[in-house]
A protein has these predicted regions:
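Non-catalytic accessory segments flanking enzyme active sites
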Residues: 44-140, 151, 230-283, 325, ...
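Blade-edge beta-strand/turn elements of extracellular beta-propeller
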Residues: 124, 167-179, 214-226, 263-271, ...
Length: 436
C-alpha cells in the first residue's frame, strides 16, 4: 500500500514582509465552523485523503495489534468501571454519580434527605444511544429541585445545545438553546438560566439571560466582550446573593457583578482590567473577597464590605515565595490552600476566634491535598478533604474541623492490584544553577 499523497496547489502568501508559497492553502475552508457542525461539508478530496491515511496507518500498525490490545487492557485494568461517588447534600436532596461496567457514561442520582427512594435523573448511556458522538457540557438542577438544565454536543463541534427537562416526568419543557459554550447558571428564583453564546469564531463572547418557557430569539443580552483576546463566563457567589461575570485572557481578568433581585441585570465593574493582573471575587458574610496578584506576585486575599466597595483590607497578605490559593466558606470556618516550596498545604480558620492552623490529613512527606467544592451545606463542622501522593491513590476523608477527627470514606481502587507499601517516596533538595 502506497503512502497517501495530497495534491499540491502552490498559492503565494505574504505576511510581515515575507512572501512564500503554501502548497496546501487550498485545504482551508472559509466555512470551517459549519464543517465542525456538519462533517458532510468537508471538502470531498480532503475527506478521501483522511480516510486513506487512516487505512494506511491501520495497515502499517497491524503487527502491533496484539500489543495495542494488551496495553489497552493494562490501562483499563487500573480503572474501576463500576463505581459510585460520594453523596453530597444540596438543599432537600443528596446527589451523587455512578458508573457501570457495561456503560460508557455516568448516571446521576439523588434521593430526598431522610428517604430511601433513589431517582436517576440523568443516564448518559440512554442520552447517547444512537449518536455517533456524545459529550456532556453541564448538568444543573434548579434551586427548587424540579428541573434539570443540561447541555450536549452530539457532533464533536464543541457547540453545545442546552435543554431543560422536568425531572418528575423526564419531559423537555421548551425548545433547545443552540450555539452555546455549554455552561449553565440558574437564577436563584428558577425563572431564568444564564448562558454564554459562541461567536462566529467559536469564542464565548456574549452572556444571555433566558426566561424559562420562551424562545431563544427573545433572550436578553446582558454582557458582551468586544476585545478579541478576551472571553467571558458567568457564575454565582457562595452566599447566593450575586452573579459574577468574568472577562479574561491568559494573564488578565476583569469582574462584573449584579444582584439577584435586578429585574433587568446591569453588570457593574469591580476593577478595570490591567495587563498582567488577575483577580477573582466571591461574596460571603456581608463581604466581597478578592483573590488577586495585584502587587502580589504569588497572590493575596483582600476583602471589603458590601456597603464599602473598593475599601479593601488585607485578609491574607502576600508572602514571599508562597503561592496563596482561594477560599472555601462555611458558617464558622474558612478554608484555604497555599503552596510552599512546591508542596501544597491546607489551612483552616475559626471565624469566631480568628485562629488559623494547618489542616493535616496525612503524615506522608509529599502529598497533593484538596477540599471538596461540592459542599453545599455551609452550616456544618464537617468537610470532605482528600489527598493523593506518588505512592497513594486518592483517599477522601470526612474531617471534623472542631474535633479534628477524620474518617476515611472513599479510596481510589486499582482493580488490577496495587500495594502502596512496595514504594518509598522521599523528597530531596539540591541547589539549582542559580544557587537556590
Amino acid at each position: 500500500m502506497n503512502i497517501p499523497k495530497l495534491r499540491k496547489q502552490p498559492i503565494k502568501k505574504d505576511c510581515h514582509g515575507y512572501t512564500w508559497e503554501d502548497d496546501y492553502a487550498w485545504i482551508h475552508q472559509e466555512n470551517i465552523l459549519e464543517v465542525l457542525k456538519d462533517g458532510t461539508k468537508l471538502l470531498p478530496e480532503v475527506k478521501t485523503y483522511l480516510e486513506a491515511e487512516n487505512s494506511y496507518t491501520k495497515k502499517q500498525m497491524r503487527d502491533t495489534e496484539n500489543l495495542q490490545k494488551k496495553l489497552f487492557q493494562e490501562i483499563k485494568g487500573r480503572i474501576k468501571l463500576a463505581d459510585e461517588g460520594l453523596p453530597y447534600k444540596d438543599k432537600a436532596y443528596e446527589y451523587w454519580s455512578k458508573t457501570t461496567e457495561e456503560g460508557n457514561y455516568s448516571k446521576r442520582l439523588r434521593k430526598k434527605i431522610g428517604s430511601n427512594k433513589v431517582e436517576v435523573y440523568w443516564d448518559g448511556d440512554v442520552e447517547a444511544k444512537g449518536k455517533k458522538f456524545f459529550s456532556t457540557g453541564d448538568l444543573s438542577v434548579s434551586y427548587n429541585d424540579e428541573y434539570l438544565a443540561y447541555s450536549i454536543d452530539d457532533k464533536g463541534s464543541e457547540y453545545f445545545t442546552i435543554y431543560i427537562r422536568r425531572i418528575s416526568d423526564n419531559k423537555i419543557i421548551e425548545e433547545p438553546i443552540v450555539d452555546t459554550a455549554g455552561g449553565i447558571v440558574w437564577s436563584f428564583d428558577d425563572q431564568f438560566i444564564f448562558y454564554t453564546k459562541l461567536d462566529k469564531l467559536h469564542r464565548p463572547k456574549q452572556i444571555f439571560r433566558h426566561k424559562i418557557g420562551t424562545s431563544q430569539k427573545d433572550d436578553l443580552l446582558i454582557f458582551e466582550e468586544k476585545e478579541d483576546s478576551f472571553t467571558c463566563s458567568i457564575g454565582t457567589s457562595t452566599d447566593e446573593k450575586f452573579y459574577f461575570i468574568t472577562s479574561s485572557e491568559h494573564t488578565t481578568s476583569e469582574k462584573y457583578y449584579f444582584t439577584h433581585d435586578e429585574k433587568i441585570p446591569q453588570p457593574k465593574l469591580f476593577i478595570k482590567r490591567k495587563a498582567g493582573i488577575e483577580y477573582s471575587i466571591d461574596s460571603w458574610d456581608s463581604y466581597f473577597w478578592m483573590h488577586t496578584n495585584d502587587n502580589a506576585k504569588d497572590f493575596k486575599i483582600v476583602r471589603c464590605k458590601h456597603s464599602a466597595i473598593g475599601q479593601w483590607e488585607d485578609f491574607i497578605p502576600a508572602k514571599d515565595e508562597v503561592l496563596i490559593g482561594g477560599l472555601v466558606f462555611l458558617k464558622d470556618w474558612i478554608l484555604r490552600s497555599e503552596k510552599i516550596n512546591a508542596l501544597s498545604k491546607l489551612f483552616v480558620r475559626n471565624v469566631k476566634t480568628d485562629h488559623e492552623e494547618e489542616l493535616i490529613i496525612s503524615d506522608e512527606e509529599v502529598i497533593s491535598p484538596g477540599i471538596s467544592l461540592k459542599q453545599k451545606d455551609k452550616n456544618t463542622d464537617i468537610v470532605r478533604v482528600s489527598y493523593e501522593s506518588p505512592k497513594t491513590p486518592t483517599r477522601t476523608y470526612e474531617y471534623n474541623l472542631k474535633t479534628k477527627e477524620k474518617k476515611l470514606v472513599k479510596e481510589l481502587e486499582i482493580p488490577s492490584g496495587y500495594n502502596r507499601d512496595d514504594y518509598i517516596v522521599r523528597r530531596l533538595n539540591c541547589d539549582g544553577h542559580d544557587g537556590r
